[in-house]
């Protein structure tokens, strides 16, 4: 049954293999009277042309197209006709999960696991996500390759013990690629929160390990954060900094987001004080704004990604409005800004 419309049409192109799979997906979308499928294709070149011709509000891309067609379609759409892209991935294994992360780096806004059967709950989540990202103004992604970095461990520096906390949401993986590749030799632990469906977090960590200039791992409860290493919040779990650089994890629903940027930043403010360095990247909503303000009030350095380089300026803008941002920087200046902040803490 199609539900009543609210007057705002979301024009959508579906890029998926032909047959029952694509038909089922389109049927699920059409249950929302406001979502209109204006194009469909199982071929990358044809999909790229359809998007350029129809100028949809959202493109849905399944990652199971033959060869590397899905990735190629995403890269070319974002380079030629920037459009909010939702990717669907089936059963996640060691091959598929990194593909989802690469798609996010290429410019896709969101990723959802594709179920074998669309339950009412999963169908509602799909339609809700389509409507949400349809409102996002996306930026052009002219490059398709992953950034490379040379991995090296950093020695513990003299002076205070700085701690870097980075948080991102929509558009975050691409921004993280740029930043992490520029952190070679950083003499501080780096704690990362990325809003992402739980099923994709392991793939994110694996991919980050390949593009980062520093070793990357999933954070574990009670481990000590070491300088020159990057710790990523597990899926569906808050990451906090405790005393003596001890990491704390919990799944208590204290925020709409789990992991939460506010939870991470607030804990860094409490535990590191003026040695805390907060970095807020692209994303929808306002998660992280209050936590970043807490770091600044304790004397720490707070950086945020500027509007021009953000896929979505919501989170940095919310922090700026609160007066939480020490310095607003373009993406390519954030890694140097982090190095500078660490040296400032240690001086």
Predicted segment positions?
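Conserved acid/base catalytic micro-environments in cytosolic active-site loops
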Residues: 1-36, 40-347
């Amino acid at each position: 049954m199609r539900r009543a419309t609210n007057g705002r049409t979301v024009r959508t192109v579906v890029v998926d293999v032909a047959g029952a799979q694509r038909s089922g997906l389109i049927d699920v979308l059409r249950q929302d009277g406001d979502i209109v499928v204006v194009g469909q294709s199982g071929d990358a070149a044809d999909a790229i042309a359809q998007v350029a011709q129809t100028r949809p509000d959202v493109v849905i891309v399944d990652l199971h197209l033959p060869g590397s067609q899905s990735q190629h379609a995403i890269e070319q759409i974002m380079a030629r006709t920037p459009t909010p892209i939702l990717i669907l991935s089936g059963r996640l294994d060691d091959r598929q999960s990194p593909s989802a992360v690469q798609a996010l780096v290429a410019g896709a806004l969101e990723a959802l696991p594709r179920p074998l059967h669309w339950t009412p709950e999963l169908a509602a989540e799909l339609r809700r996500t389509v409507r949400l990202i349809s409102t996002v103004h996306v930026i052009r992604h002219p490059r398709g390759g992953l950034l490379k970095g040379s991995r090296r461990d950093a020695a513990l520096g003299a002076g205070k013990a700085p701690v870097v906390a980075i948080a991102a949401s929509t558009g975050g993986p691409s921004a993280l690629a740029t930043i992490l590749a520029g952190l070679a030799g950083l003499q501080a632990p780096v704690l990362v929160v990325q809003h992402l469906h739980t099923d994709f977090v392991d793939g994110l960590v694996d991919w980050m390990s390949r593009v980062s200039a520093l070793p990357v791992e999933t954070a574990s409860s009670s481990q000590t954060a070491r300088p020159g290493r990057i710790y990523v919040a597990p899926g569906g779990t808050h990451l906090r900094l405790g005393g003596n650089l001890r990491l704390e994890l919990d799944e208590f629903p204290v925020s709409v987001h789990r992991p939460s940027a506010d939870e991470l930043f607030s804990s860094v403010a409490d535990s590191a004080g003026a040695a805390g360095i907060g970095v807020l990247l692209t994303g929808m909503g306002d998660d992280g704004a209050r936590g970043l303000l807490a770091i600044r009030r304790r004397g720490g350095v707070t950086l945020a990604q500027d509007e021009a380089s953000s896929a979505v300026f919501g989170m940095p803008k919310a922090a700026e409005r609160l007066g939480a941002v020490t310095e607003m920087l373009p993406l390519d200046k954030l890694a140097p800004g982090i190095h500078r902040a660490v040296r400032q803490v240690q001086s």
